A protein has these predicted regions:
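ABC-type ATPase nucleotide-binding domain
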Residues: 154, 185, 203
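Glycine-rich NAD(P)-binding loop of Rossmann-like domains
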Residues: 170-179
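Domain-scale signature associated with acetyltransferase and cell-envelope carbohydrate enzymes
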Residues: 1-158, 179-181, 198, 214-215, ...
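Beta-rich strand-turn-strand
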Residues: 136, 140-141, 188-201, 206-211
Length: 235
């Protein structure tokens, strides 16, 4: 029994989430549980394992199109930040693909849109204490966006691989790649063709528009440039 209790209450497990919810919010937790079941069903097509877990008062709007592929080997955690309960959303159009490899957390007013035939990969948590998007941010995918493990995305961040409109003489879209253990600060925009290597930090309000190759570097500016190398950071 002791081993079972220890396993159930291990950080990040369904048991710990359930027990904490019932203990701290006995009246409101059933609503969060029902919303989590519905969101899991919409995203994955089944309700067990319960991969989507909503915090108290949080709402996740889910739309999954025909023949789309959603793979959650980790858990999608929807929590509050700064007391906000603005709904977040995930939209996967027909024949699109969304894969979340490890636990990934999103806050309020986070919107993820994957259009027809596009692919989005989120590495989630692997070694760090958490990985995810704080709040008020948007990811829009027309072709391919890959975000590695143990990444932190702050608030007011925009990530997209497309212009979303045709501009004469310019490529409409190009894949975006973000490595492992990357910290994207407040107000950053990551646009088509951007490559951010593992271990990098992107300074606040920066605009990333091209491919970088040096890991563990500080990228900052409009457009972003390599400011410093040999960066070390942690949560």
């Amino acid at each position: 029994m002791r081993k079972l209790a220890s396993a159930l209450l291990k950080p990040g497990t369904l048991g710990r989430w359930f027990v904490a919810g019932v203990y701290h919010h006995p009246l409101r937790f059933p609503v969060a549980l029902c919303r989590s079941v519905v969101a899991t069903k919409k995203l994955t097509g089944h309700i067990f394992p319960l991969r989507v877990r909503l915090g108290i008062g949080q709402t996740l709007r889910v739309s999954v199109g025909c023949k789309s592929r959603v793979t959650l080997t980790g858990n999608l955690l929807v929590n509050s930040w700064g007391g906000s309960n603005i709904p977040s959303s995930i939209s996967c159009a027909d024949e699109s693909s969304l894969a979340i490899a490890g636990d990934f957390e999103i806050g309020p007013n986070v919107h993820i849109e994957v259009v027809r035939g596009a692919n989005l990969t989120l590495g989630g948590k692997r070694h760090s204490s958490a990985s995810g998007i704080t709040c008020n941010s948007r990811i829009m995918v027309e072709n391919s966006v890959a975000i590695g493990a143990d990444c932190i995305i702050a608030w007011d961040v925009y990530i997209s691989d497309s212009n979303w409109h045709e501009i004469t003489g310019m490529t409409r879209c190009a894949p975006v790649s973000i490595g492992d253990h990357v910290w994207i600060s407040h107000g950053v925009s990551v646009l088509k063709g951007a490559v951010i290597p593992s271990g990098c930090v992107v300074g606040a309000k920066s605009l990333v528009t091209k491919s970088f190759s040096t890991e563990r570097s500080l990228l900052a500016g409009i457009p972003a440039k390599e400011i410093r190398s040999g960066m070390e950071w942690s949560r």
